[in-house]
Amino acid sequence: MSASSTDSTEIHISGIARDSIVDGEGIRLTVFTQGCPRRCPGCHNPDTQPLVGGRMTTVGAVLAELDENPLLTGLTLSGGEPFLQPAALLPLARGAHARGLDVWSYTGYTLEELRAQENPAVDALLDELDVLVDGDYREEERDLTLHFRGSRNQRVIDLAATRATGTLRLLYKDE
């Protein structure tokens, strides 16, 4: 894919998993963003919580990693809290879609909390996502049998179907 002006956009990350099968359907490249204000007890990624630490990378560098693995079916944004840097992640999500990949994101916020922010960058990122796994992790609701989430309060929202129907659509709704 050709370089674009957004390739130099910086993203603060903790790390990258290059061939994840646990962060969404298929084989995924997962970007773990750095920084999360939620501090959920029992957090799966506590090292991603501090706003300091991690490293800076660029959208272009992550897109190049997507290009290196023809087996990938998607990109997952995790954390940390991806919605602390929605403007930086938007061109990454668009670049993944341009490559024919689906895009999932995890967040400690609910979809309703994110929409209530009335933040154009948050709204634009939500509009670009295919799936959102929302809600804070709750140790008392932990359930290892759930698909792609750790506690029963979390939802796996099919945002593409939600946009198409105007009604909230969940994946794995029978769990």
Positions of predicted regions on the chain:
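P-loop/Walker A phosphate-binding loop and immediately adjacent motor/lid segment at beta-alpha junctions
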Residues: 85-97, 104, 142-175
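Conserved Radical SAM active-site core
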Residues: 8-14, 27, 45-125
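Conserved C-terminal portion of the radical SAM core fold
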Residues: 69-77, 133-136, 163-175
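N-terminal [4Fe-4S]-dependent radical SAM core
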Residues: 1-32, 41, 45-51, 168-169, ...
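Receiver (REC) domain switch/active-site residues of two-component response regulators
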Residues: 130
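Short glycine-rich anion-binding loops that position phosphate/pyrophosphate groups of nucleotides
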Residues: 82, 137-138
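Residues at the C-termini of beta-strands that transition into short coil/loop
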Residues: 17, 136, 160
